Design a protein with these regions (language model features):
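Glycine-rich phosphate/diphosphate-binding loop of Rossmann-like nucleotide-binding domains
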Residues: 58-65, 71, 85-104, 230-247
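Conserved phosphate/anionic-ligand binding catalytic regions in large, soluble enzymes, centered on
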Residues: 37-56, 146-149, 236-244
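Acidic/glycine-enriched edge-of-secondary-structure segments
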Residues: 46-61, 198-206
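N-terminal glycine-rich anion-binding loops that anchor highly charged ligand groups
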Residues: 31-44, 48, 71, 76, ...
Length: 247
């Protein structure tokens, strides 16, 4: 694999992304549902795109979340929904949309108690932890992330009650319903104001990081690592798990 000519160099100013332009495009661009590239398209359990080209906007996120609200009972989830976001700028904007739709639909969202980023494994573990001794009112989750995609990209994926990636039967149902809503100009989407949603009883703080880190020694021999007196250097490179290493 060829090494990029800019590998190992500082970011150039001309490569910076325009946050104001991204935010404006996210909130004001309405996708052309006749264009396949602007429809909701689920890949590995989620939808990814850019606000600038009309493939990841507030309309997309709202429609996807309403679709989840419409179908999650069929997927076996009637309890809370765990929400995590990564470090991409669009994730911050989409996070507000997610809470607005969930709260308007009366779905309880468990969010990070200190407003930190939440990596996918932590959301998966939270779902399993919650569901482990329950037979009903099971939880599912949403992770707001385009994974490894560039900084100007956004994404969102759904994890069902199993904690892992959603299967094609689930993603197809969400995709179809979301596109139906988009075709109707999201008239079937329930939303409330961002501030109202955050202050509602449907948004509940949850200690993702503390609980996840505390459970690591149940699967990792921490004493052996300490006794080996290894010196380990970690660079999270802007990943959403960066603060998990500190803790």
């Amino acid at each position: 694999m060829a090494v990029h000519e800019l590998a190992g160099t500082k970011v150039r100013k001309e490569d910076y992304i325009d946050l104001k332009a991204i935010a404006a495009a996210y909130h004001t661009t309405h996708p052309d549902v006749a264009d396949p590239h602007q429809q909701v398209r689920f890949g590995t359990s989620g939808h990814r795109g850019q606000a600038g080209n009309g493939s990841f906007t507030q309309d997309h996120v709202a429609a996807i979340n309403q679709a989840v609200c419409n179908f999650r009972k069929q997927f076996g989830a009637e309890g809370p929904l765990f929400v995590g976001e990564d470090t991409h700028y669009l994730s911050k904007l989409a996070y507000e949309t997610v809470l607005s739709v969930l709260a308007a639909n009366g779905v309880t969202a468990y969010v990070d108690s200190v407003g930190d980023f939440v990596p996918t494994p932590s959301v998966s573990r939270a779902i399993l932890r919650y569901n482990s001794h329950r037979e009903d009112r099971l939880a599912d989750g949403l992770i707001i992330t385009p994974s490894h995609n560039p900084p100007e990209h956004g994404g969102i994926k759904y994890n069902p009650i199993t904690g892992g990636p959603a299967g094609s039967d689930i993603t197809k149902a969400i995709e179809t319903e979301a596109n139906r809503l988009l075709a109707g100009h999201n008239e079937g989407v329930q939303m409330m104001a961002d501030d109202q949603a955050k202050d509602s009883r449907f948004v509940v703080p949850y200690d993702y990081k503390g609980l996840y880190v505390a459970e690591l020694d149940s699967i990792i021999d921490m004493d052996s690592i300490r006794d080996a007196k290894l010196r380990i250097l970690v660079n999270a490179l802007g990943g959403s798990g960066m603060n998990y290493w500190h803790q």
